[in-house]
């Protein structure tokens, strides 16, 4: 088996992206600085623009370069959290500590009211869609251990978004690699009861399934179910010099879905595509190098 390698590029996002060849990246998992939350003390940084519109425009510019380096059948997983409009002071990050002496402030952006939720993730998602990206999914990252908030007039924020974006309508996505455990006992008892009295739910379910072999023909109970769009993943502490680290358990399913565990073909660059048996619709573990949806990129060790 070929040894996995990786390369770390440090610097301005656009400048570093420009060093990569066209259509050379298989999958992108990214979480850019959120709008109006923190000053990292870097000139020209993303996140401290005067208005949400300027912030969105900056990200659209970055993602145009992402689109250039992404393979035509590649995927992007974009994590973004929201912000609230307020007169505030930003904390300036200084390695592991926050230098509160260098704080500076910002006012409520034009067009918004104090305490408005700004809807930044969706502003970015729609702008990228308008710029030519396919917006395929809005994954909810549910945090069972969210940061405490002192508010008493709204619920505590306990989720962020992970948008799945693509360059085309067809792309590489390994659904088998990220299947989740199926809980089907309730469905089985409700729709496949052996008792004499069949409920209306039984009949409706059978009618809905039609010629697809009933609900059993639509579901693969033995091998799990297609991953849902709400991912419950706890935040994790990090001792390094960073204040907003994505949990590895959030990154892992993105990489597994967007890349092939067997790598890619050395001749054509296509990934090894998983082949499913038609009889059971279950993955066999076999792979095909001539996949119509193919991607290439760097494999992260341990994922």
Residue ranges: model-predicted function:
Residues 2-303:
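Core catalytic lobe of class I
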